[in-house]
Amino acid sequence: MSFLKKSLLLILFLGLVSLSVCKEEKRETEEENENEENHEEGSEMKRYMFHLMDGEAKKRDSEENEIEENHEEGSEMKRYAFGYPSGEAKKIKRVSEEENENEENHEEGSEMKRYAFGYPSGEAKKIKRESEEEKEIEENHEEGSEMKRYAFGYPSGEAKKIKRESEEENENEENHEEGSEMKRYAFGYPSGEAKKM
């Protein structure tokens, strides 16, 4: 029985608390509504005092907006007529300049990092890549030339080099023999021909 009484008292107490909370919320809501109504009445009085009726104020705002739009259209026409960039073009130009500046700063930062850690710069990589490409192109050209020579029966670069070296050796040998002949004649030694006789 005691338990039943305690639970009923607890329920009754909670009901009273919730009722008082609801009354407090209702009173606060009524006060807020009253304050809002007073504010609206005050605003209406101010508008009436300063001759700014709702319709008149809206009319003025629309006229001001129309004047501003006409001014912007006129400015746009002037820019177009005299070749000046519009606000949008200026914005695009400014954005591209900022992107270029950011890219330059990034490249400078990357260059500093490469320098600090001993990595080659983009320019060095580019030069290295170009030289490798040139070597590859030259090798491909040489291979193509070698195939053509083989196909058409022309001597290859190596064969030409060997032939040229043997011709140079023969020429050097002839020059040496002529020089030796001149020396022998100048100093009175018999030549190889004279020795044979």
Curated annotation (Swiss-Prot):
Compartments reported by the entry: Secreted
Domain of life where this protein originates: Eukaryota
Signal sequence, start to end: 1-20
Annotated stretches, region: Disordered: 24-197
Keywords: Amidation, Amphibian defense peptide, Cleavage on pair of basic residues, D-amino acid, Endorphin, Opioid peptide, Repeat, Secreted, Signal
Gene Ontology molecular-function annotations: opioid peptide activity
Biased composition (Basic and acidic residues): 40-62, 88-97, 123-132
Tissues in which the protein is found: Expressed by the skin glands.
GO cellular component, one term: extracellular region
Pfam families xref list: FSAP_sig_propep
Comp. bias regions, Acidic residues: 30-39, 167-176
Residue numbers bearing the D-methionine modification: M49
Family according to the record: Belongs to the frog skin active peptide (FSAP) family. Dermorphin subfamily.
Name used for this protein in its record: Dermorphin-1
